[in-house]
Amino acid sequence: MKTIIIIPARWESVRLPGKPLAMIGDKPMIQHTWERACESNADEVIIACDSKIVYDAAIKFGAKVIWTPDAETGTERVFGVFKQKTKDVDFIINVQGDEPFINPKDINEVIKVVHSNPDKVATMRTDLIGNEGKDPNVVKAIC
């Protein structure tokens, strides 16, 4: 079963414009995220972007990149790539571009879940800390 990871990267981020290329150490955030995703058991990792500057940077560090039209959310951007890849892909995992410290083992757990339950949707989550539950910028999952 072919599983790919699509990493949406938006240059015009509302809260932090240019976020994909924000430097963490000596690498841009999107490169860290891509490298972690590449360490997983996914068959392919693709960056979906809307900006020439992000596209060029990702190509430079070796990523496969697909240009996507304007989208309101990262999930919309992932769906744009999904529509192009549906013929040869069984599962798509959406890893947000601002997850430079994501653990590849956690991605592998999601891969195991979707392979075992192909008619289900899986989402990684963690417990909220402190006032995160009230922060509109923190995504919440109801379990």
Predicted features along the sequence, with ranges:
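N-terminal glycine-rich phosphate-binding loop and ensuing alpha1 helix
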Residues: K2-C49
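Residue-level preference for the first positions of well-ordered beta-strands
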Residues: K2-I4, F91, V121
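Short beta-strand segments
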Residues: P8, N94-Q96, M124-R125
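Short glycine-rich anion-binding loops that position phosphate/pyrophosphate groups of nucleotides
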Residues: W11-S13, G97-P100, L128
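Short, high-confidence coil segments that cap the C-terminus of an alpha-helix
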Residues: A42, K87-V89, S116-K120
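Short phosphate-binding loop-to-helix
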Residues: I46, K52-V95, E99-K112
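Conserved core of the sugar-phosphate nucleotidyltransferase
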Residues: N103-C143
